């Protein structure tokens, strides 16, 4: 009887040690992109246009992007009104828009267009909401880049009624990160984000001293931290507006440089 009890103790100890060893050998937990961002309901609004026929005058703006043509957004972009901009939280969101109910303004047979929010259409309190103050709150308005507008509407129309909805952002390649500033004040630009497209949270971790550190939104999609990040391989964790997370492990090498864009291998769906 004693032998049976002792043998049981030995077996349990062995099982415990094996489990402990397996736990030590297990890889670190990775935040994965579970599921996909799904399109939202159709809503009604109006659209105007700004910039030149080649997209000039629309390549930067209130979201902090420096050149949308090089950051994964092209010229299929839109400056949205304050309710959609959300103090920068709406930057990077993708919308499907189509011209409706304007036989003289809509382009016949035009397919719906997908654009990315990259700028703010500021309010014009000196004009009424239905006569020049198109972007005055609480209006949800789309000031499209001229190349985008001309795909669905006639230039002479100036303003057209549209139907729109949020859709998944389909991007080529992984999420991109660009750090500017100096060792004691880092501004991190996050771009080329798929899925929901917008960024609601960002954290960084180094491979040496820097533990997981949340960044604060500076403006648009520029995120700031005073943590000294130089000399370490950096991992970023992005949370989009639908609360999905993706971790870009060691996307910046230990000798990363300010002003250089680094691209992860993965993105949101």
UniProtKB/Swiss-Prot annotation:
* SMART domains attached to this UniProt entry: DPBB_1 (SM00837)
| Gene Ontology biological process terms from the UniProt entry | plant-type cell wall loosening
| CDD domains membership | DPBB_EXPA_N
**Principal place of residence:** secreted
A GO cellular component annotation in the UniProt record? membrane
Occurrences of domain Expansin-like CBD (ranges): 184-264
| Family recorded in the similarity comment | Belongs to the expansin family. Expansin A subfamily.
**Name of this protein:** Expansin-A32
């Amino acid at each position: 009887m004693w032998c049976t009890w002792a043998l049981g103790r030995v077996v349990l100890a062995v099982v415990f040690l094996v489990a402990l060893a397996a736990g030590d050998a297990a890889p670190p937990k990775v935040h994965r992109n579970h599921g996909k961002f799904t399109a939202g309901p159709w809503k009604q609004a109006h659209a105007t246009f700004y910039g030149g026929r080649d997209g000039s005058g629309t390549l930067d703006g209130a979201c902090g992007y420096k050149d949308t043509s090089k950051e994964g957004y092209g010229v299929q972009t839109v400056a949205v009104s304050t309710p959609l901009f959300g103090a920068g939280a709406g930057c990077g969101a993708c919308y499907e828009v189509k011209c409706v109910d304007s036989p003289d303004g809509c382009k016949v047979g035009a397919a719906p267009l997908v654009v990315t929010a990259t700028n703010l259409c500021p309010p014009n309190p000196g004009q009424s909401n239905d006569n020049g103050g198109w972007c005055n709150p609480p209006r949800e308005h789309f000031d499209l880049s001229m190349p985008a507008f001309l795909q669905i509407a006639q230039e002479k129309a100036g303003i057209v009624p549209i139907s729109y909805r949020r859709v998944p952002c389909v991007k080529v390649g992984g999420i991109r990160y660009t750090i500017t500033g100096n060792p004691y004040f880092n501004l991190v630009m996050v771009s080329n984000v798929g899925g929901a497209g917008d960024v609601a949270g960002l954290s960084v971790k180094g491979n040496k001293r820097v533990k997981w550190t949340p960044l604060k939104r500076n403006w648009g999609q520029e995120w700031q931290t005073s943590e000294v990040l130089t000399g370490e391989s950096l991992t970023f964790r992005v949370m989009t507006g639908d609360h999905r997370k993706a971790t870009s492990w060691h996307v910046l090498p230990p000798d990363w440089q300010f002003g250089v864009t680094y691209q992860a291998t993965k993105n949101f769906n």
